[in-house]
Amino acid sequence: MRNFILLFVAALFVGCASSGVQVTTDDEKSQAIKAAYDGYLANDFSASNELYSDDTAIYINSVESISSEENLAAFSSHHDFYSDISMSNGGVDGAYIQTSVYGGELGTWTHAWFIWKGTGNASGNTFEVPCHVAYQWGDDGKVAQTWFFSDQSNHLKELAAAGVEL
């Protein structure tokens, strides 16, 4: 009986052990990304400017990085080509944002999933695009790299309708 009790207590402690990955949605990093998204929707990039360092690598559907200045200029231009820009997830306004602390070499990542929606000013078409963005945080508390994944085909069509040569 004593061995059974010891085995039960040992199993209880092992069962309660942390998996090593900690996931949160209301932490400081998730809130910083949410503030940047709220700013994007209002065409105000001051919160975004606070996220990036001078050497942040940003990848948009590519293995070739762009600078944070190029990234912010591209996202700001959305307001030139679209109206009624919104982000939602599962019918809820805003993006779903979570931060995962992996530890070791993997570090801390914040992920965002959302449906981007906007009406093209040139075409009048409304587009909905599923998006996933992953932000890796550096030791300095700034975003070290960003990976943005979405289908850009509708955006390219809208740019063509607006007469932009690519």
Label each residue range with its predicted role.
Residues 1-5:
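Positively charged n-region of N-terminal signal peptides that target proteins for export
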Residues 6-15:
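Bacterial N-terminal signal peptides
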Residues 16-46, 50, 165-166:
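Short, low-complexity N-terminal intrinsically disordered segments enriched in polar/charged residues
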Residues 20-24, 123-126, 154-163:
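A short acidic/glycine-rich loop-to-helix N-cap element
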Residues 28, 45-110:
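A solvent-exposed, acidic/Ser-Thr-rich amphipathic alpha-helical stretch
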Residues 52, 62, 114-116, 133, ...:
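A mature extracytoplasmic/lumenal domain signature
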Residues 107-142:
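Exposed beta-sheet edge and beta->alpha loop/turn motif
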Residues 142-166:
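Low-complexity, intrinsically disordered terminal/linker segments enriched in charged
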